[in-house]
Amino acid sequence: MSNYAPFIKPYVEYNEHGWGPCEVPELDVPYQPFCKSDRLGKICDWTAMVPEKKFPSKYASTFGNNSQYAYFYEDDDSTFHLVDTTGSKATKPYQRGRYRTNMRNNVRTRGRTGRGTPNIASLGGSTAGGATASTTKYGKGRHTRNTQNVGRRFGRNAPTRIRESSVMVQSNWVSIEEIDFPRLLKLALPNIKEGKDIATCGSLEFYDKLYDRVNLRNEKPLQKMARVVHTVTTTDDPVIRRLSRTMGNVFATDEILSTIMCCTRSNYSWDVVVEKLGTKVFLDKRYNDQFDLLTVNETSVEPPMEEEGSINSAHSLAMEATLINHNFSQQVLRIGDQEQRFMFEEPNPFEEPGVDLASIGYRYRQWDLGNDVVLIARCKHNAVIQGPNGDMQFLSIKALNEWDSKVTNSVEWRQKLDTQRGAVLASELRNNACKLARWTVEAVLAGSDQLKLGYVSRMNPRDHLRHVILGTQQFKPQEFATQINLNMDNSWGVLRCLIDLVMKQPDGKYLIMKDPNKPMIRLYDVPENAFDSDRDEEESSEPLSNSNDN
């Protein structure tokens, strides 16, 4: 006799004529209609339940309350009758705790007892949904309701916007590293000294101080300047090619460096091509890329939508902001053959015969980042001005543009720019935090003495071709970096982290990309011919300039 329990083989039904069980024993089971939100209030119906006075339908089912819409099949036409469409008041189901207010801290309730709460607005606070409360003479609260956020529930918010990547990731690309923004924000590389000039090229025109007097009562129209700006990448720069033979091991431009150093403030996707040749690393941008376009309202709560044919789409606004920035930086200069120019040691390396180039001075600077990492970058100035002591001060000139304050829910410049310029700048810092941080980093890298910001707005919100200059403002780059909470030690740390990561890899081509929908930086190993098609398209294109229709 075995000590174990006997194993009884179960009976398994086999259906030879179809799927499922062979027999269905439970047929004609009555169905009781119910609602999942009904509250269970009793277990057994031993005695009749005493209804409550306040909530008589506390345990009633909410299924089929509107019986006038129920369908009953009958052949007798005598039951046909007209339905009263005036509507019937449906019995509200009982729901525990729904929209129950805090009776203890209710201003209206406590006001009747003479012990009203203090004015919430005077303490700097506000009620939920943006409603403010105040106390009247007799203690009864008076509420100003803002129904924008009232009744918002979980899952009813606006859907998350899915952004597109700046470059399509191919299947043969190898993912090497993923670094999220919280890790990057903890990095720091302190005690980086000021960059040392190793070459200066080009010439600069002087800034016209008359534009410092521009205000809302004396606005100036923005002109279209027919000047060419060459946006040459790192490996195509002849000066960087010459310097790379004898000095440095990391080479880049100020636009590429500012993009990497301010990556933790970016929301849109971008990418930087990295080429490693022995001990040298070249940071490049892709050919025919949108890298040089300025973003608009990138860090806003509601950034611009991508709508084809709309002047307020993200791409159209980026093109508009780029042209505004180019035109403004050249219009505020003292232009003319008789005007004085500041000449650097070497001529413009991108000068072409018969082409009117924009006023840009290039400074090739060198930084020691430690651990035998020597960075050489091309930086630029837009203008020069004579200081109070007779010394020359270099300027970085940028322009902020307003397109439609009603759509963006921001401060209207034509009402607040002269009286509350700080509020206007704070609104721009909130909506364009990444762009302003990049401009500040570029000015710091170039060693500019001043960062000149211009406020340019559309003449009409529906016309994206005509603009006016409403005012200007200037800052010292280092002080402005402190005001916008830009930590240069952290920016240098982020750059050094990515450089060290590339230095550990074998020779080849890599891609640093900002994830379009996550706060994360990705590093890919890409083939050598990954972007050759973009290079062919770029060689057939022209440098950035103003056309007649822009």
Curated annotation (Swiss-Prot):
Keywords: Cytoplasm, Initiation factor, Protein biosynthesis, RNA-binding. One of its GO terms (molecular function) is translation initiation factor activity. The keyword Cell inner membrane does not apply. Residues 108-152, 527-550 are annotated as: Disordered. GO terms for cellular component: eukaryotic 43S preinitiation complex; eukaryotic 48S preinitiation complex; eukaryotic translation initiation factor 3 complex. It comes from the Eukaryota. It is found in: Cytoplasm. InterPro entries: eIF3d (IPR007783). Transmembrane segments: none annotated. Residues 290-304 are annotated as: RNA gate. Residues 115-136 have a biased composition (Low complexity). One of its GO terms (biological process) is formation of cytoplasmic translation initiation complex. Component of the eukaryotic translation initiation factor 3 (eIF-3) complex. The eIF-3 complex interacts with pix. The RNA gate region regulates mRNA cap recognition to prevent promiscuous mRNA-binding before assembly of eif3d into the full eukaryotic translation initiation factor 3 (eIF-3) complex. mRNA cap-binding component of the eukaryotic translation initiation factor 3 (eIF-3) complex, which is involved in protein synthesis of a specialized repertoire of mRNAs and, together with other initiation factors, stimulates binding of mRNA and methionyl-tRNAi to the 40S ribosome. The eIF-3 complex specifically targets and initiates translation of a subset of mRNAs involved in cell proliferation. In the eIF-3 complex, eif3d specifically recognizes and binds the 7-methylguanosine cap of a subset of mRNAs. This is Eukaryotic translation initiation factor 3 subunit D-2. It comes from Drosophila sechellia. The lineage of its organism: Eukaryota, Metazoa, Ecdysozoa, Arthropoda, Hexapoda. The gene is eIF3d2.
